[in-house]
Amino acid sequence: MHEQYQPREIEAAAQSHWDSQKSFEVSEQPGKDTFYCLSMFPYPSGKLHMGHVRNYTIGDVIARYQRMQGKNVLQPMGWDAFGMPAENAAMKNQVAPAKWTYENIAYMKAQLKSLGLAIDWSREVTTCKPDYYRWEQWLFTRLFEKGVIYRKNGTVNWDPVDQTVLANEQVIDGRGWRSGALIEKREIPMYYFKITAYADELLESLDELDGWPEQVKTMQRNWIGKSRGMEISFPYDVASIGNEGVMKVFTTRPDTLMGATYVAVAAEHPLATLAAQHNPELQAFIDECKRGGVAEADIATQEKKGLATSLRVQHPLTGELLPVWVANYVLMNYGEGAVMAVPAHDERDFEFASKYGLPIKPVVRTSAGDETPAPWQDAYGEHGQLINSGIYDGLDFEGAFDAIEVALQKKGLGQARTQFRLRDWGISRQRYWGCPIPIIHCDSCGDVPVPEDQLPVVLPEDVVPDGAGSPLARMPEFYECTCPKCGAPAKRETDTMDTFVESSWYFARYASPNYDKGMVDPQAANHWLPVDQYIGGIEHAILHLLYARFFHKLMRDEGLVSSNEPFKNLLTQGMVVAETYYRTLENGGKDWFNPADVEVERDAKAKVIGARLKTDGLPVEIGGTEKMSKSKNNGVDPQAMIDAYGADTCRLFMMFASPPDMSLEWSDSGVEGASRFLRRVWRLAHAHVSAGLPGALDVAALNDEQKAVRRAIHLAIKQASTDVGQHHKFNTAIAQVMTLMNVLEKAPTAGEQDRALLQEGLETVALLLAPITPHICHELWQQLGKPGAIIDAQWPKVDEAALVQDSLTLVVQVNGKLRGQIEVPASASREEVETAARGNENVLRFTEGLTIRKVIVVPGKLVNIVAN
């Protein structure tokens, strides 16, 4: 074992072992638990950026962990290869998009391999290849014949710069999502997917997706936007709020309006901001809500928390004043960011009201009766006859809906709303670099789908577009053809499909990428699907994830897959952000400098307080941390990182710096720290191995000091297993391993048992880090004399007996100040603990002459003696 940690050699050796052994190629193994782990495939833009590295490292850690659980793990990779950037690059460099795309794929594939990802490359798909898109064309012709795809004149969003049509979702604040150009409306004939026919199912089956972040499901619900309900305005109480106005809520249960006992607003709601102005406690809670998590924590399952404000709003029918609460279960981007809370008939409101002692007023007679005692019963949410509702008593849901609507309309405080926001998906694009639409236009037969035996309609790959509309429309050799029905001269469709179509089904093709008898091999598809864990950015919450769910249902209805949903669990990783630096130009613009070219000065808390450009030594402005981007020139090249430190350091930093669903702030010192930690692990292992490997550990013969070391080992296993396996909190799992390393570095190594214990400790470190830093762990495992490769080892099991403590160290406080420590048997009673604390020599000094009023014992932690 080399004395120094040499990442380059270690990583090359591990990768070459995995390649030669085909370690990550999988096949269907009936009877073995499967795990399909998928990260969103990249667009081959030229080279990987840190966002890619983060995404694929998270996926890889999960895949490798699941393999250590004994599962048959599929982790494939491919290329979302059609799209606008290839055309733009082609125009700029006068090169065919195909050539540019394939060169980028080759380079990026090598980059992905250098990260050491456990990918089955035998399943690679490239969406711009005819053997992939022919099946997309086949499905198109099937759906066209069934009427699920149709052609009509549509008013479209026309991007005058990109010369193409954009979907509604691709228009942000009236501008094109890619070009930033102001969008025009135009009428042209287009093909549409009838996604509205699936709107109800797309909405309803969201409820089955327990493993999805609530935020994403909410965004999809809002996008589909089915709402049969009422918008109700609660007038401000001027005395407490200080001005006139209304708080709007949208409710699907206006029949329960008379049971509203408080209102709850999201942390970002204007009333929350107002209430927090002179209330530091509330401001702190709001900050906590904003930090926390709709990203990963499922709102439905997290603990409901809230704080009261001094604000009141008026009940729109009774005028009664209702308190305004700020609550973590109300989302700003759902509805109006406020809810009228009816605890008797809504489970979340019920939980909240019960916790905070708010009134619960039943106003609907349900199958559970007229009362709503705790605990919550599903029956409380039923429709039924109104009670305790004054003039509305006795009305059913429909009757109450109508009567309450009339009353609210009279006051100008409410109206009914029912709608779907979702529109059919227009997929025609006047672009070249996309999948050709398989339709032939015949003067006598109309629009004729291309017959299956004539598929694929191949896109010519040697075209260099010039930016003015579609080159295909100027290529008679492409569009001139004969009608498959009548044989007359006809014209091929020259529009191509929206590139979101390719990414809507790629996950299914991975199950049988080389199958040539259909879109998927149903047997293989049903073996692997649905995907167990999908990982990608929150920016795909609506578009891609909605379209993929839609396509999965289309494939199901074609008999290709049997499941209803494509992705069982979804993890949306946060952005990678970094400091920005600039100088303001004379024209008011900004010249951005890469952090690598800037010398910074930091204060004691490591905050940047000054910056100079290395080349001229003159100051630059500090722009704050922003998402890494070309426009702000604050990207860090992953390749430079891997070359300098190795992939394991890169991976360790990515996983340690932040939980996966939060933003990750780039930090050179953090990368240095990750590198230092791996060198520490290597040093300890080297010293241990050089002394010769020890014999077996005799657990029964351990002394107290050795028991404490072994307890640290198994505590790390226990914590890391929960963190990685249940919560994807890789950062805290790594912290556990760091804590364990501190113990192992100080542990004695004199005796044979000491060394056997260190062997168990180092094996544990290697196993716990194996999914995160696979190369160094591959090498350590061999050096520690273990048979086989660590990728085939089992995740370590906790020995609960090792966690049992014979004695505990408790701190003793006098009037809240630390005054001593006591050691007591773990089985000691409260009285024995109290006696030991009172008798502590230092404690006696501080209680002398005082009367002890009470003794507070926090089991396992501390004793506080209150004396005066």
Swiss-Prot record:
InterPro entries associated with the record: aa-tRNA-synth_I_CS (IPR001412), aa-tRNA-synth_Ia (IPR002300), Leu-tRNA-ligase (IPR002302), Leu_tRNA-synth_edit (IPR025709), M/V/L/I-tRNA-synth_anticd-bd (IPR013155), Methionyl/Leucyl_tRNA_Synth (IPR015413), Rossmann-like_a/b/a_fold (IPR014729), tRNAsynth_Ia_anticodon-bd (IPR009080)
GO annotation, biological process: leucyl-tRNA aminoacylation
Gene3D superfamilies: 2.20.28.290, 3.10.20.590, HUPs (3.40.50.620), Isoleucyl-tRNA Synthetase, Domain 1 (1.10.730.10), Valyl/Leucyl/Isoleucyl-tRNA synthetase, editing domain (3.90.740.10)
Molecular-function annotations in GO: aminoacyl-tRNA deacylase activity; ATP binding; leucine-tRNA ligase activity
Pfam family, one: tRNA-synt_1_2
CDD domains for this protein: Anticodon_Ia_Leu_BEm, LeuRS_core
Positions occupied by motif 'HIGH' region: 42-52
UniProt-annotated location(s): Cytoplasm
Substrates-to-products reaction catalysed: tRNA(Leu) + L-leucine + ATP = L-leucyl-tRNA(Leu) + AMP + diphosphate
Annotated residues for binding of ATP: 630
Enzyme Commission designation: 6.1.1.4
One cellular component term from this protein's GO annotations in UniProt: cytosol
UniProt keywords, alphabetically: Aminoacyl-tRNA synthetase, ATP-binding, Cytoplasm, Ligase, Nucleotide-binding, Protein biosynthesis
Placement of sequence motif 'KMSKS' region: 627-631
Domain of life: Bacteria
Annotated family: Belongs to the class-I aminoacyl-tRNA synthetase family.
Xref: PANTHER family: LEUCINE--TRNA LIGASE, MITOCHONDRIAL, LEUCYL-TRNA SYNTHETASE
NCBIfam families per UniProt: leuS_bact
Stated name of the protein: Leucine--tRNA ligase
Upper lineage: Bacteria, Pseudomonadati, Pseudomonadota, Gammaproteobacteria, Pseudomonadales
